[in-house]
Swiss-Prot record:
Gene for this chain: SEC61
Annotated S-S bridges: none
Top-rank taxon: Eukaryota
Record family assignment: Belongs to the SecY/SEC61-alpha family.
Regions of this protein lying in the Cytoplasmic compartment: 1-33, 98-119, 168-246, 383-415, 459-479
InterPro entries found in the cross-reference section: SecY/SEC61-alpha, SecY_CS, SecY_dom_sf, Translocon_Sec61/SecY_plug_dom
GO molecular function terms noted in the UniProt entry: peptide transmembrane transporter activity; protein transmembrane transporter activity; protein-transporting ATPase activity; ribosome binding; signal sequence binding
Name of a matching Pfam family: SecY
Protein name per its UniProtKB record: Protein transport protein SEC61 subunit alpha
Subunit and partners: Heterotrimeric complex composed of SEC61-alpha, SEC61-beta and SEC61-gamma.
Listed GO CC annotations: extracellular vesicle; fungal-type vacuole; plasma membrane; Sec61 translocon complex
Keyword Cell membrane tagged: no
Topological domains annotated Lumenal: 55-76, 141-146, 268-361, 435-440
Biological process according to GO: misfolded protein transport; post-translational protein targeting to membrane, translocation; protein transport; retrograde protein transport, ER to cytosol; SRP-dependent cotranslational protein targeting to membrane, translocation
Length: 479
């Protein structure tokens, strides 16, 4: 390729960026499992190590409802979670999808430069987010902490984010299974759901001391109350603490997503190079997996962060108010959007709130479904799964769609793949909205990411580990 491109600006930084060297040969499945477990353990340890030097972390949390999805744990090395990686990926997706930057993903040098640019931006975003967090007083007044402690806090956050970037790269380059982003999110979500279901800790409310875990609370109420019916009802609908209805809603969503994973269109294929039985190429409903909802959440999280920080600094500015106004709910120091753009893209607290403000609910649903559909259709263009890319793969492998000419593969795929991507993205967005309205144990986004990731790992185990596929045959084989 000739001429100067914007992407070439990152090439001078390439030698200075940490990198995971790709394996020279394919890593065995057992070794990949081992490296995946090691990566997961490193993430879990970092999630429990508190930041050194913080005076307080009791201020309002801009990422309160997104921490589970971002695999973030406040006040620890994993404060930023996967936010820098996801935000960087989202930005470069938009730049490439709108043709602001031109990348030939079939060209190895272009692909490596593109990945380097994403990594560089992720590190720069980590530096920016860490600096904003520290200087806005999330860990105590900067004047009280001092320059040395503030610098140390920023350094810790950037170092931890760099480790997360490398762990993700380690998995994606073939040493492990899947991607670090999905793995960390799924692990964080499963951990939080398990804790909310079985936590033995207690909280004090107007009704007295109650167990935090929904299952533990149910057995305690049934064992300590004479009126079993009333105790059972309370365990299902108790406010302000995890309840059994939320747990059952979470399980319902889990099985619904697994069931929908099986929806697909099978294109019959035949080889032009050899005779034999026809194979098939599946085009699934969730063609782009959980990418759309992850990018939608990254977009929303950045709007929430910017809006809250600007409102804390300039609460009377008209532009800032249009972006979002914030206030704490009764009995909590946590700020929530109560006006502006941030309010309308913030999920309703529950189904009752959704009914009380139908305009907000309608705008929120339209935003989630629309952005997921757009991100999904854009993603196929840069991930090598567009109709043109798939048709090219067919041609290289000597495959054609049975009953069609060699040259008609692109036309046939163009009729199906973009629709599957858009509809699948909107569907996963709709499931996220349903989760938020039903009040599952965790946000709709995080639950969906966890389920699709777990299912993806199951498929990897079937494909590469030779495990029996009959586990979910009842959900998908007959579809």
């Amino acid at each position: 390729m000739s001429g100067f491109r914007v992407l070439d600006l990152v090439k001078p930084f390439s030698p200075f960026l940490p990198e995971v060297i790709a394996p020279e040969r394919k890593v065995q499945f057992q070794q990949r499992v081992m490296w995946t477990i090691i990566t997961l353990l490193i993430f879990l340890v970092m999630s429990e190590i508190p930041l050194y030097g913080i005076a307080s972390s009791d201020s309002s949390d801009p990422l309160f409802w997104l921490r589970m999805m971002l695999a973030s744990n406040r006040g620890t090395l994993m404060e930023l979670g996967i936010s820098p990686i996801v935000s960087s990926g989202m930005l470069f997706q938009l730049l490439q999808g709108t043709k602001i930057i031109h990348v030939d993903m079939q060209n190895k040098n272009d692909r490596e430069t593109f990945q380097t640019a994403q990594k560089l931006l992720a590190i720069l975003l980590a530096v920016g987010q860490a600096t904003v967090y520290v200087l806005t007083g999330m860990y105590g007044p900067p004047s009280s902490l001092g320059v040395g402690v503030c610098s140390l806090l920023i350094l810790q956050l950037v170092f931890a984010s760099t480790i997360v970037i490398l762990l993700d790269e380690l998995l994606q380059k073939g040493y492990g299974l899947g991607s670090g982003v999905s793995l960390f999110t799924a692990t964080n979500t499963c951990e939080q759901v398990f804790w909310k279901a079985f936590a033995p800790t207690t909280s004090t409310s107007a009704k007295g001391t109650e167990f935090d875990g929904a299952v533990v609370a149910m057995f305690h109420l049934l064992g300590s109350r004479k009126d079993k019916k009333r105790a059972l009802i309370e365990s299902f609908y108790r406010p302000n603490l995890p309840n059994m209805f939320q747990l059952l809603a979470t399980l319902l969503v889990f099985f619904a997503v697994v069931y929908l994973q099986g929806f697909r269109i099978e294109l019959p294929m035949k080889s032009t190079r050899q005779r034999g039985p026809y194979g098939s190429y599946p085009i699934r409903l969730f063609y782009t997996s959980n990418i759309p909802i992850m990018l939608e959440s990254a977009l929303a999280s950045n709007i929430f962060i910017i809006s809250q920080l600007l409102f804390m600094r300039w609460p009377n500015n008209l532009f800032v108010k249009l972006l979002g106004t914030w206030d704490a709910r009764a009995g909590s120091s946590q700020l929530y959007a109560n006006g502006g753009l941030a309010y309308y893209i913030q999920p309703p607290f529950n189904f009752t709130d959704a009914l009380l403000d139908p305009i907000k609910t309608t705008i929120y649903i339209a935003f989630v479904l629309g952005s997921c559909a757009v991100f999904s259709t854009t993603w196929i263009e840069i991930s090598g799964t567009s109709p043109r890319d798939v048709a090219k793969q067919f041609k290289e492998q000597g495959l054609v769609i049975a009953g069609h000419r060699d040259t008609s593969a692109y036309k046939e795929l163009k009729k199906i793949i973009p629709i599957a991507a858009a509809f699948g993205g909107a569907t996963i967005g709709a499931l996220s909205v349903v989760c938020d309205l039903m009040g599952t144990l965790g946000s709709g986004t995080s639950i969906l990411l966890a389920v699709t990731t777990i299912y993806g790992y199951y498929e990897l185990a079937v494909k590469e580990g030779g495990f029996n596929k009959s586990i979910v045959s009842g959900f998908s084989d007959g579809i």
